[in-house]
């Protein structure tokens, strides 16, 4: 089976990094977490901000949920986007509005000033999940037009895009969510963080659990920071592999929507064609998402989305796709 449903990094960590985890990440496993400040200090130094500007979260999902609960009286989303942006207000019985930003010309943020002016919270992804890319000026422009908070999920920032993590001093209603899931391949350890003005971060800190992240995850994150060169090279390899596979699909006649993440997206002309393709892949034990799948909102079932896997996985999928006949 080739499971490409989830957008995590498919490569296993190299032995030398795993050995570091075994020696160091688990050393405090018997103790309640006491190492938050050490990681926060390192992140503050990395981003050239103060420690009071950062709070650790149990992955980006907890960060989204916390921000929604603290600031989300009236939330605005731009679809298609990450499903948790929709799930958090639904789960917490919060008011929300979703604007569709995809048409025949592609993805672009579309709004009237009245759409954003009085919202208490606006969620953005940059790069967007599943596709689309905002420039810094667009994000700051939205932040300057609203009285509320603009929370920017930068989970995929290592794949592409221009971060706004150093803009919150001049744009005080910005909150930036980061994750170790994609840029550092630690999706299974559920560790992320939020950066922003100290006053906003303190409001979030007051609502989170005291021990919301395990000491194992914190120690692993610090090891990952030490191995930044390895992870940067890995992301570049994945980007190159994904772009190559997109090129292959175009040559085979598929309609491709280029992404700025590790996702590959095919847009079919009709539902029947998408159904046939997914049925064919399923018969070959290749698992993909049709429509929203498990992590997206705003896609209909003419979209087929899957992660860029390992080099071997993608070569195997390429061989399988070459055998596809639309009359299957």
Predicted features by range, described:
Residues 102-158:
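Active-site phosphate-binding strand-loop segment of PLP-dependent enzymes
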Residues 44-66, 78:
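Short loop-beta-helix segment that forms the pyridoxal 5′-phosphate
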Residues 1-31, 118, 328:
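N-terminal "arm"/small-domain region of PLP-dependent enzymes with the aminotransferase-like
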Residues 5, 196, 265-271, 285-328:
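Conserved PLP-binding active-site segment of the aspartate aminotransferase-like
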Residues 12-14, 35-37, 173-250, 254-257:
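PLP-dependent aminotransferase class I/II
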Residues 50-54, 154, 172-173:
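Short acidic capping loops at alpha-helix termini that bridge into adjacent secondary structure
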Residues 252-284:
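Conserved PLP-binding catalytic core of the aspartate aminotransferase-like
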Residues 69-124:
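PLP-dependent aminotransferase-like
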């Amino acid at each position: 089976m080739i499971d490409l449903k989830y957008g995590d990094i498919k490569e296993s960590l190299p032995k030398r990094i795993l050995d570091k985890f075994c020696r160091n990440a688990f050393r405090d496993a018997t103790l309640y977490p006491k190492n938050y400040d050490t990681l926060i200090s390192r992140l503050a130094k990395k981003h050239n901000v103060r420690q009071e500007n950062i709070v650790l979260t149990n992955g980006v999902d907890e960060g989204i949920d916390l921000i929604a609960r603290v600031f989300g009286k009236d939330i605005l989303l731009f679809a298609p986007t990450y499903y948790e942006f929709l799930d958090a207000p639904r789960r917490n019985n919060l008011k929300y509005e979703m604007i569709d930003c995809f048409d025949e010309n592609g993805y672009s943020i579309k709004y009237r000033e009245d759409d954003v002016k009085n919202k208490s919270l606006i969620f953005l992804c940059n790069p967007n999940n599943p596709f689309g890319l905002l420039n810094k000026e667009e994000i700051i422009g939205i932040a300057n037009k609203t009285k509320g908070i603009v929370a920017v999920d930068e989970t995929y920032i290592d794949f592409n895009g221009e971060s706004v993590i150093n803009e919150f001093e001049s744009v005080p209603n910005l909150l930036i969510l980061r994750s170790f899931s994609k840029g550092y391949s630690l999706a299974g350890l559920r560790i992320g963080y939020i950066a922003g003005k100290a006053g906003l971060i303190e409001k979030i800190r007051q609502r989170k659990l005291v021990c919301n992240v395990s000491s194992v995850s914190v120690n692993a994150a610090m090891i990952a920071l030490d191995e930044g060169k390895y992870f940067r090279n890995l992301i570049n390899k994945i980007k190159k592999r994904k772009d190559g596979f997109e090129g292959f699909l175009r040559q085979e006649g598929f309609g491709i929507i280029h992404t700025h993440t590790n996702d590959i997206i095919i847009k079919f002309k009709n539902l029947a064609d998408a159904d046939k393709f997914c049925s064919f892949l399923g018969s070959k034990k290749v698992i993909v998402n049709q429509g929203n799948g498990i992590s997206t909102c705003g896609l209909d079932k003419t979209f087929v989305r899957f992660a860029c896997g390992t080099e071997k996985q993608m070569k195997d999928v390429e061989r399988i796709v070459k055998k596809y006949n639309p009359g299957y």
